[in-house]
Amino acid sequence: TLLRGVSLSWDGGDPYGSQAKFMPSQASLDALAQEYGYNTVHLYLEGDSSGNTDPVGYNAADCDILVERCAKANLYLIITIGCNGENGAIHSMDFILDFWRFYGPRYKDRTHVLFESKNEPVHFTAAHWVPKDWEDQMLMYETIRAAAPHTMVLLLSYMGFRYEGAVSDAVRYLTTHGVDWSNAAVA
């Protein structure tokens, strides 16, 4: 399925604290699908950065509402962890894993909800990734899979591509280490 849509930032913005949370109405979500032909909302649900001290789950109640509204509008909802302007970094792997342990079970039965492991977890392009970065992707994938075995998982959210084989190298590594691509994809 080709995904097309809009993004929402509930992680506090870039930098953290610069952007207020916006909750779209049911009517606006319905319009995205019916009038504009979109099928997806991409949500930076919470942020992993040095300036963001909010605990995992601080947006859960609002996310529950958005999950319901997206379902009613026949929209996919991609949930991810933002960077708060510290793009290309993992500030706290503990935060990321706790995020998926919290939200994975919460939405695992919602077939319109997809999980993006972490938005822009490494600097620059796919060519700058090293095996440790791929190991981090595996750890996130395994944590999500333990909590939500059937939810679509989006991996390898690059900022850009520098050489043609970069993604293939990462996909080969992840495949060798157990990613099941029948229910996972490159973001």
Residue ranges of predicted features:
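N-terminal carbohydrate-binding accessory modules
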Residues: 1-40, 53
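Short, flexible active-site-adjacent loop segments at beta-strand->alpha-helix junctions, enriched
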Residues: 7, 12, 83-87, 119-121, ...
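Extracellular glycoside hydrolase catalytic/binding regions
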Residues: 21, 97-101, 105, 110-114, ...
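Conserved beta-strand scaffold positions in the cores of enzyme catalytic domains, especially
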Residues: 5, 45-47, 185
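Substrate-binding cleft and catalytic face of glycoside hydrolase catalytic domains
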Residues: 29-107, 111-123
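Residue-level preference for nonpolar/small residues embedded in alpha-helices
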Residues: 24-25, 62, 136
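Short active-site-proximal "capping" loops at secondary-structure junctions
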Residues: 11-13, 46-50, 160
